[in-house]
């Protein structure tokens, strides 16, 4: 059997991108927008397999059923892994259905979290997550009430600072994690810097760099799940399972703090699932979820989405009422640079 494997730059090769999307849809899958490159397999001038890479995640992997059992899956995965390594991406993840886990195990992937029979998260290392948790454990602090916040801060607002202040005042120590993925309006580097500036003067807080084990909803692949509600549920289950069973025990976290969410139904539903999944009895110690009411200014809750809208309007007076000086300065400089390049 003569197979031809080809690399496709999805952002440049529109005809092949459309062909891959059609092939995936024939198999009840879809090609997600963040996919950068793909490997396709052709047999007798017919597309019979594909796999794509987005950041450090392998996804959109499918094989024509008529050729399953011919070793095509392993060939495709091997080529996809070679591409990832050439791009300098050695720490890889993939999400798939549990029924496919054995296939990927044969290519060197291990399961690290699972949402029932619907989704499993795998990575190409048996020890990497354990090593990361050992590194986290070096930042343990003494105390009976150890808190955590996971923050996107897109961008950092006075509401974020208030949440950190309140949580820190209620704990013996607070661990603050930043969502790492660059799937927000502002880069991870900029968001981390604004948080670092914004929490100046708040005691008993450790700011942790972003981690691939804090799963962003924006980058969670749902190409193999048909309904949006199922995608959201699987994301929260996998993300919160990793937090409760691996990250939190490393730091002996007992409480997780969130702000109330009056504006975004998606985040509000996530907070509800968080309470259910973190507080339920289980093998790992339960974590109490503490929901703090958002502060309000000028007739509405202080939120990053509100700041982004005011930023687009260049309403600096209104922005200044909602963000610390560091965020305001950053946004004004960003607006100036955008104006100069326009």
Curated annotation (Swiss-Prot):
Residues 1-127 form the N-acetyltransferase domain. GO terms for molecular function: [citrate (pro-3S)-lyase] ligase activity; acyltransferase activity, transferring groups other than amino-acyl groups; ATP binding. It catalyses: holo-[citrate lyase ACP] + acetate + ATP = acetyl-[citrate lyase ACP] + AMP + diphosphate. CDD domains: Citrate_lyase_ligase. It comes from the Bacteria. Keywords: ATP-binding, Ligase, Nucleotide-binding. Its EC number is 6.2.1.22. It is an enzyme of class 6 (ligase). One of its GO terms (biological process) is biosynthetic process. Acetylation of prosthetic group (2-(5''-phosphoribosyl)-3'-dephosphocoenzyme-A) of the gamma subunit of citrate lyase. NCBIfam families: cit_ly_ligase (TIGR00124), cyt_tran_rel (TIGR00125). This is [Citrate [pro-3S]-lyase] ligase. It comes from Klebsiella pneumoniae. The lineage of its organism: Bacteria, Pseudomonadati, Pseudomonadota, Gammaproteobacteria, Enterobacterales.
């Amino acid at each position: 059997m003569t197979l031809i494997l080809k690399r496709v730059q999805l952002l440049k090769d529109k005809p092949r991108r459309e062909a891959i999307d059609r092939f995936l849809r024939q198999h009840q899958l879809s090609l997600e927008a963040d996919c950068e490159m793909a490997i396709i397999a052709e047999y007798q001038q017919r597309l019979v397999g594909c796999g794509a890479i987005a950041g450090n995640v392998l996804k959109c992997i499918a094989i024509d059923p008529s050729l399953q059992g011919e070793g095509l899956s392993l060939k495709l995965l091997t080529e996809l892994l070679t591409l990832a390594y050439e791009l300098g991406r050695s720490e890889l993840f993939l999400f798939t259905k549990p029924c496919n886990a054995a296939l990927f195990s044969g290519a060197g992937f291990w399961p690290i979290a699972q949402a029932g029979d619907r989704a499993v998260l795998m990575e190409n290392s048996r020890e990497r997550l354990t090593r990361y948790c050992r590194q986290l454990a070096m930042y343990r602090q003494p105390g009976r009430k150890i808190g955590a916040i996971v923050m996107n801060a897109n961008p950092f607002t006075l509401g974020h600072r208030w949440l950190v202040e309140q949580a820190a005042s209620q704990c013996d120590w607070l661990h603050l994690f930043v969502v790492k993925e660059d799937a927000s309006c502002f880069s991870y580097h900029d968001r981390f810097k604004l948080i670092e500036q914004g929490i100046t003067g708040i005691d008993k807080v450790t700011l942790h760099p972003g981690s691939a084990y804090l799963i962003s909803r924006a980058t969670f692949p749902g190409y193999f799940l048909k309904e949006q509600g199922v995608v959201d549920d699987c994301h929260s289950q996998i993300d919160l399972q990793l937090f409760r069973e691996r990250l939190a025990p490393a730091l002996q976290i007992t409480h997780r703090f969130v702000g109330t969410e009056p504006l975004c139904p998606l985040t509000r539903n996530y907070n509800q699932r968080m309470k259910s999944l973190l507080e339920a009895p289980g093998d790992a110690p339960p974590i109490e979820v503490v929901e703090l009411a958002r502060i309000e200014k000028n007739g509405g809750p202080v939120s990053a989405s509100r700041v982004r809208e005011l930023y687009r309007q260049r309403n600096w007076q209104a922005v200044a009422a909602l963000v610390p000086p560091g965020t305001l300065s950053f946004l004004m400089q960003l607006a100036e640079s955008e104006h100069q390049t326009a």
